[in-house]
């Protein structure tokens, strides 16, 4: 067995010096005359135990001691922030979506067709948050999105050459929200039928036929949608305002040319079949929601970190537990760096990699009394 280093002076001039009352080998340094024992670092093993529980259906109530020993062994890992990797992988398609954990806490997730590429914690879906997410990912050929606010601005700045496919299912749902499934007017019936056909377009010919049918609908009901009503107070408003909003939502997508990117021959010849919806990523994003349901009762901060842990473990090459503990930031390390910087330095850095600076301040309190988020 190699002689250990003295933790006090770093010398290897040590010798065995009996055993402690628990039976552990005691060592004595010949230089500084200090005695010490070696401690086995099992933090990586405990982190694996923690992640095994978090990503499973195991209940703490079913553990020995009703989970008290488990909580004591793994409490420190709730202070770790899993950070997204910087990847140079150029993907054919990237899906972007957000998970809201509270009214003003959102985790934006970007993933390829196989694994998670990155994530970002923010207060809402805005251009600043999307830019922080997209800046760490190589521009793909096509990005599929549900049309979250701020995405287009961020894409124009960071991924200007990337084609956008607006999720056709979300476009249909937006129309259905205005028309309902049982429209009261013929215009609403026809528009709802058109919206359903939007989900069935499979090639460029069917896409062109849908666009022609939509143009005819707009022309046929143009005068009908211009009708106005004046109420008793003298205020004038559009009679069919909800139909107008449904039309405007589709018209904006047609003008942006983002509805039928997936059947563009120039892209399909080079990239093959492309997705029309982000249903695949929606179903995968349902997994962290299911994980949170399995572990009901977590605080908001722990729910955020749980989703970040899920994202990290579903990247292409998740780090081993020992490397995670060496590489990832903790609450204490982040707070220490923030205290070390002046206000001007913090302002010049912009948003932190793990999320908005505002989220950090609101998730941590300086007094023993907390505030409820939900």
Annotate each predicted stretch with a short phrase.
Residues 28, 35, 66-161, 280:
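RNase H-like nuclease fold core
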Residues 54-64:
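Short, charged amphipathic recognition helices of the HTH superfamily
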Residues 16-26:
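Short linker/helix segments within small regulatory modules
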Residues 6-9, 29:
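Short cysteine-rich clusters marking metal-coordination/redox-active sites
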Residues 97, 146-195:
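Conserved beta-strand -> loop -> alpha-helix junction used to position metal-binding or nucleic-acid-contacting
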Residues 1-4:
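A broadly conserved sequence feature marking short terminus-proximal activation segments
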Residues 26, 33, 37-49, 142-148, ...:
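Acidic/histidine-rich catalytic cores and adjacent linkers
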Residues 11-15, 37:
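Short functional micro-motifs and their immediate structural scaffolds
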